[in-house]
Amino acid sequence: MVGYTEALTDPSYNGQLLTLTYPLVGNYGIPDPKITDEDGISKYFESDKIQIRGLVIHELSLTASHWNLSMTLDEWMYNEKVPGISGIDTRALTMKLRNSGVMMGALVVSDSEIDVEEVKKQLASATHYDSEQFMDEVSTKEEKIYGSEEQTVVIVDTGAKNAIIRNVREIGYRAILVP
């Protein structure tokens, strides 16, 4: 099980609108992204940025409390220009998604009235999720080496989470991340 910080930065969710079913999200905030382990890998994030295109939740906690708090979820998403929506029956939405499979969707943010028909047109003409090339966005561009042990595990980065690298390191191997 992971928290929302790990989920939002998980490369496997790149390009998706992520729906969380827990009724209250944001109550422990976001930890300091500068906190890393001895290999320089973030301790609390699965990649170096938010990977999702939008977040759908039932209720956002605007008050966060945690010993490692650096900002609220709302502040983090605002700073990273990732839209979110609350007030949604996420459990009903999840059941619809479970029955229907992947569906195209849009979160539209505007200071003026939203033209729903225009949004529908844009969504209909958007690149379908199945056709997008996410590998270019989530893969490392250059080889990265973690540790200096003789025994080595090579990780072909097709969207590898930081946790995979951390786990390889924890069992005593050098990790080499390659594109």
Task: Describe the function of each predicted region.
Residues 1-152, 156-179:
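RNA-binding accessory domains that recognize and position tRNA/RNA substrates
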